[in-house]
């Protein structure tokens, strides 16, 4: 928890949708980025707005998996989904803070972990760039694991340029950082071909239109750049729903 005395924090008319705080500080050159009360950044607050909206079903009755769980979003999900909330990670021991036991899940082969149609929802933020496996297979297998009516909500870092990846296990960490901005990233998502390279993996899923409940003014109040809803950015939330059986009739 970050205290209200967070260095550089200033009060404003902004409002954190996670904790209700109204003091925000600069972070990595981004003004009003970090909530002084809960430590949330722009992408966490945007995710919270989407999760709390009426667009996301809350009574699906199946496990809702949250990968690489962040404390701020984990609290929101536990509030919304109760016993159906399931945090998960490849290395669960790193989440000693979690009040819900974190399940060990390897996302390289999702259908080795999840039965088709057994999951109510997947939520993850800045996770797909880390997975040393075909991104096409990972996403499509996750979608296959969703039950009808289930949802898949995610964020990824988006950079200028084109998609590229290199999963060579022998690549030097400094070279990987140079190419992909972090030593454990396998790929970079680019704004030039994001629609074709990533969103087309969701063929057969319904894209949830966030503009119906969220607009640029709401984002500004939550100290989120309005570009997050108009462009592909690292803060942007992508939300999809698997058609229910009745939708097919």
Predicted regions located by residue number:
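Activation segment
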Residues: 94, 111, 131-132, 162
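S-adenosyl-L-methionine-dependent methyltransferase catalytic module, highlighting the catalytic core
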Residues: 133-249
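Short catalytic micro-motifs in class I SAM-dependent methyltransferases
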Residues: 126-130
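Conserved N-terminal segment of class I S-adenosyl-L-methionine
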Residues: 1-117, 215, 230-236, 243-249
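A conserved beta-strand element that flanks and buttresses the S-adenosyl-L-methionine
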Residues: 123
């Amino acid at each position: 928890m970050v205290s209200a005395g967070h260095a550089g924090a200033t009060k404003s008319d902004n409002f954190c949708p996670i904790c209700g705080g109204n003091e925000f500080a600069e972070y990595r050159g981004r003004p009003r980025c970090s909530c002084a009360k809960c430590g949330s950044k722009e992408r966490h607050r945007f995710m919270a707005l989407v999760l709390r909206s009426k667009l996301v079903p809350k009574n699906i009755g199946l496990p809702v998996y949250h990968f690489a769980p962040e404390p701020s979003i984990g609290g929101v999900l536990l509030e919304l989904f109760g016993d159906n909330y399931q945090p998960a990670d490849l290395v669960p021991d790193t989440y000693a803070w979690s009040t819900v036991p974190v399940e060990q899940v390897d996302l390289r082969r999702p259908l080795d972990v999840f039965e088709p149609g057994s999951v109510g929802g997947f939520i993850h933020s800045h996770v797909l760039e880390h997975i040393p496996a075909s991104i096409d297979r990972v996403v499509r297998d996750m979608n296959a694991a969703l039950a009808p009516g289930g949802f898949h909500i995610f964020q990824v870092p988006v950079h200028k340029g084109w998609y590229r990846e290199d999963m060579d296990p022998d690549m030097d960490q400094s070279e990987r950082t140079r190419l992909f901005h972090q030593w454990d990233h396998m790929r970079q998502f680019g704004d030039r071909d994001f629609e074709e390279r990533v969103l087309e993996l969701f063929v057969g899923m319904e894209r949830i239109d966030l503009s119906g409940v969220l607009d640029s003014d709401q984002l500004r109040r939550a100290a989120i750049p309005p570009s997050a809803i108009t462009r592909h950015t690292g803060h942007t939330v992508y939300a999809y729903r698997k058609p229910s059986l009745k939708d097919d009739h």
